[in-house]
Curated annotation (Swiss-Prot):
It comes from the Eukaryota. Pfam families: Fe-S_biosyn (PF01521). Detected in retina, especially in the retinal ganglion layer, the inner nuclear layer and the outer nuclear layer. Detected in retina visual pigment cells (at protein level). GO terms for biological process: iron-sulfur cluster assembly. GO terms for molecular function: 2 iron, 2 sulfur cluster binding; metal ion binding. Residues 1-15 form a transit peptide. GO terms for cellular component: mitochondrion. Homooligomer, forming a rod-shaped structure 24 nm in length that may arise through a double-helical assembly of subunits. Interacts with CRY4; CRY4 seems to be associated with the outside of the rod-shaped homooligomer. Does not interact with CRY1 or CRY2. The gene is ISCA1. This is Iron-sulfur cluster assembly 1 homolog, mitochondrial.
Length: 132
């Protein structure tokens, strides 16, 4: 389990229209910028083996993703290994992430992980919560 309940960084979600769910090797794929950012975040945290993605009930649309550092793989976690990065998906979040791409986006005002999810039926205005 993660040693801290605080999130790693801010994350938002985007509904991806006109995209069919396609079988992939993993429930979640990472863009090169997401891989690079996770490596940067873990560089100074040798006691942590990766990040864990979870889902919580909150926000104006029902569900929201969480990101935490983790020291180990939980018994029911799904592990995604890509380009030397380990991402663990909590059991409760596994079905909500099928076919999802995890990206890291920076602009002049903000930086955040973005989950491009083809399964989402709706999001709130700020993009932090969603429903499936």
């Amino acid at each position: 389990m993660a040693s801290s309940a605080s999130s790693v960084v801010r994350a938002t979600v985007r509904a991806v229209s006109k995209r069919k769910i396609q079988a992939t090797r993993a429930a979640l794929t990472l863009t090169p910028s997401a891989v690079q950012k996770i490596k940067e975040l873990l560089k100074d945290k040798p006691e942590h083996v990766g990040v864990k993605v979870g889902v919580r009930t909150r926000g104006c649309n029902g569900l929201s993703y969480t990101l935490e550092y983790t020291k180990s793989k939980g018994d029911s976690d799904e592990e995604v290994v890509q380009d030397g990065v380990r991402v663990f998906i909590e059991k409760k979040a596994q079905l909500t992430l099928l076919g999802t791409e995890m990206d890291y986006v920076e602009d002049k005002l903000s930086s955040e992980f973005v989950f491009n999810n083809p399964n989402i039926k709706g999001t709130c205005g700020c993009g932090e919560s969603f429903n499936i």
